[in-house]
A protein has these predicted regions:
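Thiamine diphosphate
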Residues: 1-135
Length: 135
């Protein structure tokens, strides 16, 4: 199958981690980390080798560390026609995009002892009253 996969490695679930932080949950469980003596996943980053995983499934793996290298990898991927291609690029999980001037209805826990979650719930309830239904 001719397919090109772009694997963006942010060492976890950065998008959902940002969402989790925005609702007071501090991104729990959204980083690929070793567990420490505290039994929490707050140790060193897990050394996941996505390239080996993809190669093990038969893909040709290209790694791009820069924008130019990414462009070159895309071009090279077009020329590989006999099997899947996976382009892997590592990104900074802390880098975010700007706001969207919209509201996403993501419910926040109603009951929590965490003040950040309580604040997020209060804001959520206020924002929910402004929700508009278009259908």
């Amino acid at each position: 199958i001719k397919i090109t996969i772009v694997l963006i490695d942010n060492h976890g679930y950065a998008s959902i981690g940002g969402l989790s932080k925005s609702v007071g949950s501090d991104g729990f469980g959204t980083k690929y980390r070793y567990r420490t003596e505290s039994d929490h996943p707050d140790g060193e980053t897990l050394p996941l080798d996505f390239g080996q995983i993809c190669a093990g499934m038969g893909a040709n793996v290209l790694v791009a560390h820069t924008r130019d290298a990414f462009g070159a990898a895309l071009q090279a991927a077009r020329e590989i026609t006999d099997r899947p291609v996976c382009i892997i690029t590592e990104v900074d999980r802390r880098q975010r995009v700007g706001g969207y001037e919209s509201w996403w209805d993501v419910a926040v826990a109603e009951v929590s002892e965490n003040p950040a979650v309580q604040q997020a719930r209060e804001k959520y309830e206020g924002d929910k009253t402004k929700e508009r239904h278009h259908l």
